[in-house]
Amino acid sequence: MGQGKFAARNLVRTAKKFRWSDSVYSRRALKLKLKADPLEGAPIGRAIVLEKVGVEAKQPNSAIRKCVRVQLIKNGRQVTAFAVGDGAINFIDEHDEVTICGIGGRAGRSMGDIPGVRFVVSGVNGVSLNELVIGRAEKARR
């Protein structure tokens, strides 16, 4: 391949062609992250609790992480969200409306030892889950 004085057009064309083999570029150019994202690019979303589930932690840890299976209101997609805090799962009941946001793993993926869980419950029926766990607020009855 030419590196000479008049090779610029050729170099640019080749660079553009081989750029597609870079996974980061191709995902960004085709907007794959946005298409796959259940929240559709939004930072938080509202959802209805379908059931409580216990997710086993990955090795070398041994625990059952308390999560909830929820259905998003905006598009009907089902995702699993982690309930953070000691006894937090007790404040969440089926058919409650919860607010979920990303768990903060790299590239929008899961975090730590909880496999396949990419979201966190931040609120229940309009009240912060953290406030409920601390005891500073009471859950609103619907």
Curated annotation (Swiss-Prot):
NCBIfam families given in the database record: PRK04211.1 (NF003254), uS12_E_A (TIGR00982)
Sections of the chain in a coiled coil: none
An example Gene Ontology biological process: translation
Encoding gene per record: rps12
Superkingdom of origin organism: Archaea
Keyword Membrane: no
Similarity field: Belongs to the universal ribosomal protein uS12 family.
One Pfam family matching this protein: Ribosom_S12_S23
Classification via InterPro entries: NA-bd_OB-fold, Ribosomal_uS12, Ribosomal_uS12_arc, Ribosomal_uS12_euk/arc
Family matches, as PROSITE patterns: RIBOSOMAL_S12
Keyword field: Ribonucleoprotein, Ribosomal protein, RNA-binding, rRNA-binding
Organism: Methanocorpusculum labreanum (strain ATCC 43576 / DSM 4855 / Z)
Membrane-spanning intervals of the chain: none
Cellular component GO terms held in the UniProt record: small ribosomal subunit
Protein's recorded name: Small ribosomal subunit protein uS12
CDD domains: Ribosomal_S23
Database matches in PANTHER family: 30S RIBOSOMAL PROTEIN S12 FAMILY MEMBER
Signal peptide: none
